[in-house]
Amino acid sequence: MANILKTIIENDKGEIRRLEKMADKVFKYEDQMAALTDDQLKAKTVEFKERYQNGESLDSLLYEAFAVVREGAKRVLGLFPYKVQVMGGIVLHHGDVPEMRTGEGKTLTATMPVYLNALSGKGVHVVTVNEYLSERDATEMGELYSWLGLSVGINLATKSPMEKKEAYECDITYSTNSEIGFDYLRDNMVVRAENMVQRPLNYALVDEVDSILIDEARTPLIVSGANAVETSQLYHMADHYVKSLNKDDYIIDVQSKTIGLSDSGIDRAESYFKLENLYDIENVALTHFIDNALRANYIMLLDIDYVVSEEQEILIVDQFTGRTMEGRRYSDGLHQAIEAKEGVPIQDETKTSASITYQNLFRMYKKLSGMTGTGKTEEEEFREIYNIRVIPIPTNRPVQRIDHSDLLYASIESKFKAVVEDVKARYQKGQPVLVGTVAVETSDYISKKLVAAGVPHEVLNAKNHYREAQIIMNAGQRGAVTIATNMAGRGTDIKLGEGVRELGGLCVIGTERHESRRIDNQLRGRSGRQGDPGESQFYLSLEDDLMKRFGSERLKGIFERLNMSEEAIESRMLTRQVEAAQKRVEGNNYDTRKQVLQYDDVMREQREIIYAQRYDVITADRDLAPEIQSMIKRTIERVVDGHARAKQDEKLEAILNFAKYNLLPEDSITMEDLSGLSDKAIKEELFQRALKVYDSQVSKLRDEEAVKEFQKVLILRVVDNKWTDHIDALDQLRNAVGLRGYAQNNPVVEYQAEGFRMFNDMIGSIEFDVTRLMMKAQIHEQERPQAERHISTTATRNIAAHQASMPEDLDLSQIGRNELCPCGSGKKFKNCHGKRK
């Protein structure tokens, strides 16, 4: 182990020496660039672009380009990048992560690789964790880029598709990670190529890269469509039942945060819902509601996992930042179960139309890099998942912060009492204090204690993060006391006020250890920026989550023997033990993310195939007849082959029924037409007849553009519907194969094999539906459209299934508004023939 660590340290030192030499080459151009006039310096951008177009690589342009940015930054921003910032910029250009401490100027560091890569004209995405940082950085650094002749765009959620497209067309685009993901998904749901907003993903530079690529790696971005099933009553019933349970009726696994019914709980469920057997196959839906109600009531905690807004909505709290995640909902019905628990209106359950995780989104970029102050602890994951190295960059000035050993108390109460006393003492001498908490309720609790102690303070948590930057900027002033959930205000520097250095700088107090060392290091890093003095101190108790999960029983005995209910244990050994526990949790979390990626890679491969074919359809300026006719041919072959082993009479009857109801006019084919033919001859006979029907259908459109539009809309409508259903099916499969793991089967291998089979089935189903709709659609004879704008509407309107006509003798007054329409459209009656005129 010691040898491995030695090798890693030596490698890092060698890398630093190499970067220093490269930075020196940039510095050699300093005088040359300083001698240029403003116009001459700006003209360098055009020169670099031409040299790149003529075959010169970005690597060879690096030294001059970085020197141009340094000089430009000095003239425009009044900032001159240090050597360590140039080194960080080189690492970013190479597609790696420079680990740069808080306050080392990561934003300015990014300007050099962003400028260099923007010269290619293929687009650079600067990715931030929230829109405030996107707008701030785009405004501040955009001044420099614009001065140097590059265009800068900001992609915000509120922008229209046209505005988004303009932002993505710029040389440099600032955006949040979620908006890039949603735009990618939406681009793959449009019907026309001109409605796509993104260009191919080229180079991403991700700010706070660990937060996005590690903490949020498993977060799926989901574009949903409302599900028509009205299930709010079942949510309320399940919630009412679960609230009636005793502690013996359910079993919670604290480590894995899972919950299930005990035997007595099952008995109570069968009695409550009047069932013979809760786990009969017909009760599968009900057990799903009960499982969610259990999780909502006994696992998900108010003010820790979620908050209830003033608008009576459930808002998820990000466990790493403490911010509420606007617009984000728990999937699979859990969010509705929480709504039932809290007695707020239950919103419609949604169906996933498209989804992608950040892991797979960012792996699609040709080059990916990012910045963080705390990436080394996750180096293995960056390397294994993203093929990125983490290179620690030296600080411009030595770190002067004093990190005290952890203080461990027997109870939460005695811990918080000590925290309040410490804060009060520091406040009285004028030293600013930042108190970091892991949950909203902890912030509120400490706030009440400080009010009682007469200590004025600011609270920054998920409930008021819109004031984040303002509060954080003032946190370094004399006498300032700020309480913040761990990651709040990240990206905004805390600058020390007048006279604060002499008082010891900013003191950071952690109220418990996070399960990730990196988050603790980020909290510590708020103090001691740019060589400032500072302190950090963590207060722990045996009742903290991390301590309860890993070995607090032995320490509890020590406290009891020494009768130390109010006193603290302080030792380096304790700090090392806590870090060992954190390493175990980090290892577990990494293994989980790695497994999620194995599952998601199945979806990724399938998504890429579907999206590539979809893109081919929407960008095709050609007649898609060859593609559709191939689908018809394969559909015929599947049907005939599928009945190959049946008795001759049964086989012919099945094939005839298929042909009548899906392929040809009903009265145009009889049993005599097929009898006596081999399977091969039947396939050929049906295909030739189908081609005549196809030609007849297309001839009704009488316009080449209308034909193309009809073909596109037909294929895309079927593909999108089937893909949406397939995503749901894969989600259900994933849950199911998890159970198969108990039968000694590898669930990932099972998922891959079953997922591949399901994908092939979906392709067959797509081709079948395209065939049926193409052959059976009622296409009305129409004149040539007068203007192109009419084409889409008429072509879309003409896709009406042959069966979608209403029986003449039906009494419509007897049909419920939420029942399926009898015309066969698949819509609810109220949305079809029951629409109020």
Curated annotation (Swiss-Prot):
It is found in: Cell membrane; Cytoplasm. Keywords: ATP-binding, Cell membrane, Cytoplasm, Membrane, Metal-binding, Nucleotide-binding, Protein transport, Translocase, Translocation, Transport, Zinc. Its EC number is 7.4.2.8. Zn(2+) binds at C821, C823, C832, H833. One of its GO terms (biological process) is protein targeting. It is a peripheral membrane protein. GO terms for molecular function: ATP binding; metal ion binding; protein-exporting ATPase activity. GO terms for cellular component: cell envelope Sec protein transport complex; cytosol; plasma membrane. It is an enzyme of class 7 (translocase). Its cofactor is Zn(2+). Pfam families: P-loop_SecA (PF21090), SEC-C (PF02810), SecA_DEAD (PF07517), SecA_PP_bind (PF01043), SecA_SW (PF07516). CDD domains: DEXDc_SecA (cd17928), SF2_C_secA (cd18803). May bind 1 zinc ion per subunit. ATP binds at Q85, G103, E104, G105, K106, T107, D493. It catalyses: ATP + H2O + cellular proteinSide 1 = ADP + phosphate + cellular proteinSide 2. Belongs to the SecA family. Monomer and homodimer. Part of the essential Sec protein translocation apparatus which comprises SecA, SecYEG and auxiliary proteins SecDF. Other proteins may also be involved. Part of the Sec protein translocase complex. Interacts with the SecYEG preprotein conducting channel. Has a central role in coupling the hydrolysis of ATP to the transfer of proteins into and across the cell membrane, serving as an ATP-driven molecular motor driving the stepwise translocation of polypeptide chains across the membrane. This is Protein translocase subunit SecA. It comes from Streptococcus pneumoniae (strain Taiwan19F-14). The gene is secA.
